[in-house]
Amino acid sequence: KDKNLVDPSWWPIFETIDKALGGAGTASTPSPAAAAPAAPATPAAAPAAPAAPTAPVASKPTKAPATPSPAPATPKANTVEPAEDKIVPLRGPAKAVVTTMEESLTVPTATTVRAVPAKLLIENRSAINKYLASTRGGKVSFTHIIGYAVIRAVAAMPSMNVTYNVDEKGKPVAVHNAHVNFGLAIDIPRPDGSRNLVVPNIKGAEQLSFREFWDAYNDIVKRGRNGALTIEDFRGTTVSLTNPGGIGTVHSVPRLSKGQAAIIGVGALEYPAEFRGLSEKLITQQGLSKIITLTSTYDHRVIQGAGSGEFLKLVEHYLLGGDDFYDAIFRDLRIPFEPVRWARDNHIDDEHEISKVARIQQLIHAYRVHGHLTAATNPVGYKMRSHPDLKLERYGLTLWDLDRVYPTGGFGGAERLPLRTILERLHEAYSGSLAVEYMYSEDPEVRAWFQERLEHGATKPNREEQLRVLSKLVEAEAFEHFLQTKYLGQKRFSLEGGESLIPLLDAV
């Protein structure tokens, strides 16, 4: 045995054992570094020495022979039935998309991102669509309003409408486009389940009012879905808009096509991720707003990051009602009342200030007294009517209070109502198409009689009542036609808009 295999502290122990065995059993083996090769020799027999008594040495247990384990089973091959891949040639619009995307790789781009609170956008869009549904019909989408804000921002910042090109000598030039040709990314599903992306544009979009832009937008989308677009609809796009937020995408960095200045991406309308688990009641109490993420991907050869950042800031300014943005939309759509205004949530100390409940009672009283002054009673003319005593800000109320529930003191037959419902009933009762003035009466019973019938909300007539009204109108029209044909040349007075009095008399 080689003592060099163990720690030197063990060497004296092994030397003692060697001496006890007479030096015959465990001669120290020199280390390989010091050992020299020796010639083979037959060792001489040493005389037997008397063996000293030694302690019995415990023998090591003999390991049982290992039982051979069975060979692992060969795993079954993961095979599928043989099938051929389907190869579809890209033709027509699909091939054009490939060409456009490959060309976009030659455009050096950068992207600016901005999160915008969408509370005011949601409130004013809701007010617009409710009015349109009750009058001439139609619907305004979020993309309509955001797209119009983008167009106004580009018109205010011409530096965002600059494209890159080369002159006849091959030298780079910056093209300051005279008009904003606003492209709209339209996703068109096909019968086979595939989808096609087309980006037609609205020429000279900066010259359009919101109503004109709304009509042009709807027309180009309709023609796109019906396959009626022409080459001219795609030519000359300078700035385009894509809205993947409609399918839940929060943030998008789209490709910028060659020849365009910028493409604006619109994300999903959602609460921030950290607040999505909160209840609606807590969200309302805390004054949390949904946000919308806007991205501006631009040609970095002619547009710089600071300009893109200022551009998105201006878009946010418009979406928060800056420069009478929503007032212009309401006027273009001939909506007779003012839009909702942006304001920070107003916290009121009930111990030292008039509570919001008392302020709401003041607002209700103001509508009863002055509401008839804002009623839209002129069916042939248009005027946006307002009264300072009917504005929320006069009472320290904001758009953040609209969904909060307050005691009403019995208004509308309810003890507690959201401020939104209170305002809707007040507007319907006093500021709609019917003007009612009765607060001059000194008789409280008379005032209570009007309030009970006006402030509970209108009840829509059922189908039978609607058919009865229609039948009465048809009878009146038929009778007038009879008089016109029976008594020719006779002087008489026609209904001339007095038809609405007929169902009123019938109900009485």
Protein language model regions, located:
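Extended, charge-enriched "interface" segments that sit outside catalytic cores
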Residues: 27, 343-501
